[in-house]
Swiss-Prot record:
InterPro entries with a match to the protein in the record: LSD1-like, Znf_LSD1
Species this protein is from: Oryza sativa subsp. japonica
Region forming the signal peptide: none
Localization (cell): Nucleus
Region spans: Putative zinc finger: 47-77
Ranges where the record places region Disordered: 1-38
Name assigned to this protein: Protein LOL1
Protein task: Putative zinc finger that may be involved in programmed cell death and defense response.
Cross-referenced NCBIfam families: LSD1
Keywords: Nucleus
Amino acid sequence: MVASRAPRSESPWLKKPMHGVSGSTAMASTPWSSMPPSSHSLGAQSQLVCSGCRNLLMYPAGATSICCAVCGTVTAVPAPEQKSSCNVHENKERLKGNTNGFRAPQRCARRVDGACTQVAREVHTEVALVIFTLLCVTLPGLLFSLG
């Protein structure tokens, strides 16, 4: 006789009662379901550039440091009230008008939560070149085809 398998939805590692939710039928499908509910489980996340490999990292809001899964570097998360020098807004205004005065942003990256954080110049230069290309090559061609 062949033993029958439990239906996939009844596997204990796929659905576990959430810790701290007593008398509820709330279920979680992650291996972290035994952790108490936090801002991470509610979906509040931020982004930061890894100080080692420059990959974009997503992390739960409120974290103080992040360990990169790619290179293993631990990057400190700046406090929300910590502001760094930021010239992105200045460059955005410059790009709206004349691109002759174009300068690549050098000092900050915008996080999802609105704070600024220090990153390498190479990251900004690549982003700035993409923006410059879109404004100078793609946009005029699009406007010409519409007109």
